[in-house]
C-alpha cells in the first residue's frame, strides 16, 4: 500500500518538531505560511515566553491551546506532544483559521 500524506493539501497548518525543537515535518500550508523550516529549530521563530512554554510541553507532556488574531485573521493554535513507544518524541502544532462567526454547541 502506498503511503498517503493525509495532511498535504488540507486547510490547516501542521508543523511537527522532534524533542529538541527541530522541525521534522511541515505540510504545504505550514511551509506556505512560515517558509520551509525543515531541519531548523522552531525556537527562534517564537518569543521567549513561547519558547518557555514549548520547553514545558516537551518536558511535561502538556497541551497548549489558544486563539490569536493577526492581520484580521483569527486562528486557533493547538500544540500537543506526539509519542514514540510512550516517550515524548516532539510536538505537533495545528494552526487553524477560524471563521468570523462560528457556532458553539453544548451537547449532553
Labelled PLM ranges:
Residues 1, 107-108:
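C-terminal end-of-chain micro-motif
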Residues 1-25:
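Sensory modules in modular signal-transduction proteins
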Residues 29-107:
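Sensory/regulatory domains in signal-transduction proteins
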Amino acid at each position: 500500500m502506498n503511503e498517503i500524506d493525509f495532511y498535504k493539501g488540507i486547510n490547516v497548518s501542521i508543523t511537527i518538531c522532534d524533542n529538541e525543537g527541530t522541525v521534522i515535518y511541515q505540510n504545504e500550508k505550514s511551509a506556505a505560511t512560515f517558509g520551509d523550516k525543515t531541519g531548523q529549530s522552531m525556537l527562534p521563530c517564537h518569543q521567549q515566553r513561547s519558547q518557555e512554554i514549548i520547553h514545558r510541553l516537551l518536558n511535561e507532556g502538556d497541551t497548549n491551546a489558544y486563539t490569536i488574531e493577526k492581520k484580521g485573521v483569527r486562528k486557533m493554535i493547538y500544540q500537543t506532544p506526539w509519542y514514540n513507544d510512550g516517550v515524548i518524541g516532539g510536538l505537533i502544532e495545528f494552526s487553524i483559521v477560524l471563521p468570523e462567526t462560528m457556532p458553539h454547541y453544548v451537547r449532553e
